[in-house]
Amino acid sequence: MRKIIANRIITPDGTMLQSFSTHDFVKHTDANGKTYAVDGGLDYQRTFWHEDAPHTDACVYTTDPFTEIRQAFCWGSYGKDGKQPIHWKPLHTMTDEHIKAILETQHHIPWHIRGVFENELEYRHENNISIKDSE
């Protein structure tokens, strides 16, 4: 069964809205004057749109090519010390060390999200990509 990796829509004026977590309701008043919204994070997709000016569904799922998944998936981080405001980092920009730390410490994450991180490390190995910590 396919699972959501990135819950997002594109409004008629080209604005991308992305809901990162459950009940993360994100809205935008489009250039056409209509309000659009997306909600649900990786758990469900709820959108608010208009029949006469529809949005584009830009969701990414586990069944999509991994090259799309690694660009679209974002992980919320509170910084190394855990005291920073949450910052959503795209998977393809995360350091190797950060991904390994998530796999070693975040045992609560769903299997399909764990698989995304494992696949990213494999992708980097196969494509000779390494992102090191700057500190």
Language-model segments: which ranges?
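N-terminal accessory interaction module
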Residues: 1-68
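Basic helix-extension-helix modules of the SAP/HeH family
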Residues: 70-135
